Amino acid sequence: MIKKRAIFERMFPIPPPHCPPNNKNNFYHLTTDTKDPLLLRILRTIGYVLLHIITLGLLLLIHYYKHHRVVRKEGLPTPPTLPKGPEPKTIEIAKQPPKDGEDKKPDVPKPGTPPPEDTPPPPPKAPSPASPKVPKQPADKKPTPPPEAPPPPVRVATPMPLRPSSQGYWQCLNRMVSMVLRRAPLPLPAMQVDPILGDFNPHFVASYPNRIDNEPMYFQIKQFKKIAQNPDLPQQHRRLAQLSLEQALYLNDNYYLVNVPGDGNCFYRAYAVGWLSALYEESSRNDIVFEQEATRLLDLPFASSSPANANLCAEMAELLQLCSTYCSFIDLYDGVILSQKHTATLIAFLRKLSAYAIRQQIAASSNEETARALFISDMQDDLLPSVLEFLAANRPYSELFQNLIDHSALPYMQSRDKLFLLLEHLPALFLTDAELQKMSPEDQQLRKQYEREIREAFAKLSRRIADSGWDTERFNAIVKDYLPEAIRCQYSRFLATIENRRSGDLPWSPALSFFAFLCTCPSVRFHKLCATFYKSLEDIIIASAPPQRSIQEILQISNASLSYLNEDLDSSWQREVISSNIMTILTTHESLTLESSMPQLETLHKRIANLLKNVISTSFETPPLSNQPDLLSNLVNKLLVAIHSKLELKEHFNTVCSARSLRLTRDEGSGLSQEQDLLYTQAVQLLFFILQHPQVNNRPETKDAVKELKMLLLPFLQYAFKKVENEKKLQKLLRSILGSLVLKPPARYPSTPSNKDKETFCKFWSRHPEVMVLDPILEKNCMQFLRATFPNYQLETEAILLEKEIESTFRNGWNVFLTRLNLFGSKLGSPSSPTALSDQFSKSFLIFCFLNNYPKLLQKKTPLAARLDAFQREASHRFTQVKDKLLLSLKYGFPLATATINQYSRARDQLICNLLKNTVTASDGFCRSGFRQSLIGYLHSLSSNELGDILDDVKEQAEANDVAAMTTVPLQPFAVCLIMSDRDTVSEENIENFVAMHGFLNTISPERDARIFLIRFPNHYGCLLPRNPRTEDQNSKPDSSNP
């Protein structure tokens, strides 16, 4: 029996159980059919796992395309769905007169196709051209005969001529918000984040309208609730959170938010969105609103102010006409508001319009001088670097060189500021015998008379100081006897300088002399005793110089000596600017590492370092400082120990010491030992390190030693910068550096320059050939190209003849052009360029570059201009012919040259920002705003119209006056809402003024009167679109599909 059963089981095997045990699915496939090969069982298991993976992937793909599908970047948009036309039967019924007792309203369409809101049904007999055509009745069917009595007219709304079947504005707005809430596919310009890259979308123009509570980045409603309900927080914080919450809820109930890019044009972008939206909403009541707005634009005074503005208004009117042709608000939004081209037109129009309105307001309420001051005040915040770039690109170089580099005009000063300026440069008011002998006998007498008047004026001021309590006895007892030896030594050197410059016996008191010393070396004022004394005398001197009196009246200078007084004020200001600019360069971060890209910096640093070392060694090798041999060494060693105790400071200090300009060699003729020479070299290197890395002033391990060393060494540097004998040398050093700042190479080159980059360089080089000296390989290639190709016999012969006429006719421009070349190109007489750069070029190439810089000379109707024009056309043709050879020569080494040019551009930008920074006397006692004041003084020489043009070009974003100016423009009225949580604009003092208006400003337009609604976030604007109450309930809850 058992054998029969075994035979039966082998013939008919019992199948395995259909359901595996729980949690044993894979184990089931491995254990079932154990007689199968192991490989087969493993493949069966793998197939089972892959089946699960494929199934899960299909489910995820279906979910993605249902809820998270992304719109394509390219392709045609989905055409709008037009509403169905009325049925023929409905038209026949509409023609019949209503019977008594019946409602005279037309029949309502079926619920399946609701009519657009706020849009009347189309007229029965005159459907507009763009609406769907009504099907024709069969030819054999006769029309319904008219009734005997004429029926009363059926009231129907007049259709819009250009948008006959347009969908309602509120219906479209609701649909757009629903798309955002459902995460439906949106146009690419409406998405802030690129759906493919997952990064910021560079094509973003404006978002679709969204609910306020769906914008947590701007309205942190949950955070507001949490703070408002937290009893542990201060009352003012909870109140601010509660007010911010109430404002957010109010805005959420009444508005949708449209966000725009924060590129500086956010105000104009938001205004454009609100403007077009308001016009489209009004078009449901006024069919020709866009045409009326276009006509209003063309009638603005702005349209007739200039041809450019007239063209801009005409372009804007065409855009408004285009807006009137769209069939729905969504089409308008996608076609115009989300268009990069149309948005650029809107921004340009609104920017120019607001700028014109500002100018009209200033012209109507201010004179020319006040208008200039207003424009310049708008530039002084952060726009001065951009203003300088604009001037360098658009103004003649001769003007900039004369006003910013060669000679800085004395700015407007009050009488007391001029008096302090004279005291700061007191030794220079008295000439030496050698300087006096260079003058004519008559001028010598006038100069001596002027110096007598100056001595008498300061003697009178000394008596006033003594009468105020600071006589010689008190000064000696309180101040002089308690001065440190280092300050007393520097004060003695200051007095000796005055006596050596023909001042004779000082007729003024020691108190006034020491006050002038503190003005010359302001870092000494950081000594507590000196600071107290300076403040006491400063109040006395200010009281002696009332603002209503001129400096001539205060000092009682005669009219015969007035010219010398003005000369001294001007020369004192020049030295002030020189010392300020040099100190700014020395304190520019990493200026020592920029020496390789700007050779003039290395020369300046080396000259200053040698000057400082010589002054220090001379002072400490002669009495009275020679009597304290350990004074300097103790301070130097103390600071070196502190620096080497921190690895970070040690690395920075080693970088400073490795600069080529600070590798000071020992002068064998100085008589200094190696230990003394090393000490003075280390002192110079430490001072440069302090100036380059100001953080050591506050570090606990270095601040005490730094303070003492600066107190000891900085006065030497400050006094050297203002010494008359050093003025010309320092000015020569500065002219080369400041002159190079006007040279702005093209934009940053890539690491692998293309042929287009090479052509850009060639074009720039034809105007600024001095740029080639930045890189030795580039300079070599360019000079080889010039020697081999450009000197043409005919051109060179003509150039030699033209050079003499150009020099005599356009002397100023020609000299400035050569000066610019040689300032930047000569590298201050370094061995690599012993001769001037202009002498290394052929005459034909030199005149070719000169005319590229001054193309207006070719437009004059003179015989010389005709010859220059013919020469320039021939030279340009020659340069274009041989340019390929230059491009070929740039094939090798150009990437390295562009890296050097990029490094120079970075150094240039850094220096410009520091030179134009608004600073006062800092912790080191230097005022670094000389170049800034020179630029502002030059701007005051321009007209208000020129300043307005500059401001319009460099302004990066809409300022408060731009927003206020738009209220005077006869367009749609707009309101601005400030969010309560912005602490920069809404303070605790004025927050009550915004509570009643929910943050809206009454100073612009009240909320109830506005058609355009803007909201201001911290440094950003957005647009608010009013919600339709009939669709409010529909969007009050987020869609269930929204995750």
Swiss-Prot record:
Compositional bias (Pro residues): 109-132, 144-154
Disordered, as annotated region: 74-162
Annotated ranges, domain OTU: 255-349
Biased composition regions of type Basic and acidic residues, renumbered to the chain: 86-108
Transmembrane domains' residue ranges: none
Disulphide-bonded residues: none
SUPFAM superfamilies (UniProt xref): Cysteine proteinases
Record's protein name: Uncharacterized protein CPn_0483/CP_0271/CPj0483/CpB0503
Native organism: Chlamydia pneumoniae
